[in-house]
Amino acid sequence: MQNTVDSGAEAGSSNELPAVEASNVRKTFGEFVALDDVNLQVHPGQLISLLGPSGSGKTTLLNIFAGFLRPTHGVVQFHGEDMTVVPPHQRGIGVVFQHYALFPHMTVGQNVGYPLRVRRMSRDHIKDKTKKALATVQLDAFEDRRVEQLSGGQKQRVALARAIVFEPKIILMDEPLSALDKQLREHMQIELRELHERLNATTIYVTHDQREALTLSDEIAVLNHGRIMQQGTPMDLYEDPKNSFVADFVGETSMISVTRTGEKSVQFGGNELETRSVVPEADPLYLAIRTEKLLVLDPDSEATGNVFSGRVRHAVYQGESMRLFIDIDGDTEVSVRRLCQAGDTMVMPKSGDNVRLHLPPESTVVVTD
């Protein structure tokens, strides 16, 4: 079956050729299907993330774009030119790897200038371009340092500088921040986004971290079992997922099996809820509830619409928020995340408490498989 995608983003003019395009790309390793007729377009200047769990095919697709793998079937084009069998060194792309791949016997400057030496550019040209690339990643003063003298974040900046030193139109990144600690990773995400906006190079970024993809991307393509499940802007995927996999994988979500009871209503257990949009006539159906959109009502609240009851199983303090795990109807669990705000007078429920929950109709998302 051809794997088409639902794209909610507009990028580039309708007459503009995609910077990168995969057409009916399939990749097999023996009997294993790593990519199943994938179609993807990346417009010039976009940063698109390939997001998915381990084994979803995202790195395989990136390696096909890089030329490290050849598709079993299908075509890869850059700016309308067929690149399917073109070797990696002739594709004119910058690549940033997960583990930096820096040369330990070279200085920072020598590492960054290496792609230019391979291209046999003049010494003065290499020196000027190296300094410019290091300045771009804010490592001007590190040109003569050895790699072993650098922190993880500095090594990643050197890898970025090496990828951009020859000013490629296309940059590929394979989980470049996964080896960094959480605080540094989040800081580098902002730096990467700012760098992308300055360079305006088309960038394809592989990650399994949905928050990282939401932070960085103009568009996200969500993959699972070698297929693109949905492609669109971060807001499209978060607010309007097209299937249960995307709804569950992107964001913190409770998935509840429901039954259609009307054009805009569903039911689970003895609870009937109004929905924001027309419920598809399909089976199975799931109500995808974002943790931050499910509200715990005050005990004296008189709210009635889209209200249901449960019992707190666990209450977990997470610093800026409380996370509540609540049993509904004995066999269904939902999760609620509530921010801890200054001046908040509501008493936070604790384990064993009975609570009433409210899901506004505008926050309902109903999806199928």
Describe the residue ranges of each PLM region.
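Conserved ABC transporter NBD signature motif
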Residues: 74-82
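The feature captures the beta-strand-to-loop junction immediately N-terminal to the Walker
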Residues: 51-53
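Non-catalytic connector elements of ABC transporters
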Residues: 253, 263-369
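ABC ATPase nucleotide-binding domains
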Residues: 47, 88-94, 98-245
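Helix-to-loop junction immediately C-terminal to a conserved catalytic motif
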Residues: 66
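ABC ATPase nucleotide-binding domain helices that frame the ATP-binding cleft
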Residues: 59-62, 158
